[in-house]
């Protein structure tokens, strides 16, 4: 059985790591903004002290400013904690802000995998369509 005081301190620490106050830990999800819900979910994952963090569409539903803030937060945590982050995203700005390596899935197959800059130059209709004219901006 874990000590209640230890759990409270852990919750406060992990909330602080994602930019939230201890009071946010007492609120129900409906009382939080979309960005705060994402941050609470991230704090919950960090409570387990992971080496690998799995994120599924981490910025979905966030406005561009909150999305950028979340990308910066995950990037900071990745560097500070030495995390490996595996992420599913369709958001090019999230990909540009966090990814070093990319796997592109199409037709139930991995059609490209490697460093971000290399994958963006793959001559495949899906890859060129997905990255489109934004290729240069994303590198």
Model-derived segments and spans:
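A short, surface-exposed alpha-helical micro-motif characterized by mixed small hydrophobic
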Residues: 95-97
């Amino acid at each position: 059985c874990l000590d209640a005081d230890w759990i409270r301190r852990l919750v406060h620490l992990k909330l602080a790591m994602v930019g939230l106050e201890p009071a946010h830990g007492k609120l129900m999800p409906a009382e939080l903004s979309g960005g705060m819900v994402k941050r609470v979910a991230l704090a919950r994952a960090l409570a387990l002290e992971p080496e690998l963090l799995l994120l599924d569409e981490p910025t979905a539903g966030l406005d561009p400013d909150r999305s950028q803030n979340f990308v910066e937060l995950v990037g900071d945590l990745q560097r500070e904690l030495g995390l490996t982050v595996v992420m599913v995203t369709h958001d090019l700005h999230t990909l540009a802000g966090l990814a070093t390596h990319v796997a592109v899935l199409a037709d139930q197959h991995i059609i490209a995998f490697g460093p971000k800059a290399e994958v963006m130059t793959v001559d495949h209709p899906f890859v060129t369509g997905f990255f489109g004219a934004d290729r240069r901006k994303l590198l």
